Regions:
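Acidic/glycine-enriched connector segments
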Residues: 12-134, 141, 148-159
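Low-complexity, intrinsically disordered tandem-repeat tracts enriched in small/polar residues
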Residues: 5-11, 170-171, 175
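Charged phosphate-binding loop/patch that engages nucleotide di/tri-phosphates or the phosphate backbone
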Residues: 144-179
Length: 179
């Protein structure tokens, strides 16, 4: 039997998290991935620039060619299979730009409020429907909404701290008998 990450009996809900390292949702995504042992990476602005200063080295991020946040956002969307935005609508600033880049790169994009109870089920169904395993996670920075990182981290722990069973079903063998 040929094996691959996607046909394994049991695999993480996502195989890799991509995020940009900004305060808020980006860091929450990276923190939860590191905590759960899910591979993570992403692009950050040149100089590891974020609203609180330099992004700590513990985050496995590659510096983009420029210090422009928009360039970093485009690279993260491009390098993912889908983008999950954790935010309450309407989207603003860089979060809205993330959604525009998802449209440009023709990547599935879902916006959910991490404080809504039904959001986990919606995300699981969306990931399965899109067969998305490399997930860009984005949302507001901490200065735009207090506690956004905490809410995002709690949501992502509940969402990602489970296995997605991808058991390959064998076709049923039908035996006809005559009497």
């Amino acid at each position: 039997m040929k094996s691959s990450a996607r046909s394994a009996q049991s695999a993480w809900l996502v195989e890799k998290i991509i995020s940009g390292g900004q305060t808020g949702v980006d860091r929450a995504a990276l923190d939860v991935a590191l905590e759960l042992g899910i591979p993570c990476e992403g692009w950050c602005p040149r100089g590891r620039r974020a609203e609180d200063g330099v992004i700590p080295e513990r985050y496995p991020l590659q510096e983009a060619p420029t210090s422009n946040y928009a360039d970093r956002t485009a690279l993260n969307v491009r390098d993912s299979e889908a983008t999950l935005i954790l935010a309450k609508s309407p989207l603003r600033g860089g979060t809205a730009l993330t959604q525009k880049f998802a449209d440009r790169y023709r990547r599935p994009c879902l916006v959910v409020d991490p404080r809504e109870a039904k959001s986990s089920a919606i995300v699981i169904a969306w990931l399965s429907a899109n067969n998305a395993r490399v997930l860009n996670i984005a949302g507001p920075r901490e200065s735009l909404r207090l506690d956004v990182a905490r809410d995002a981290a709690n949501f992502l722990r509940r969402l990602l701290n489970r296995k997605l069973v991808t058991k390959k079903l064998e076709p049923k063998r039908v035996v006809h008998t005559t009497t």
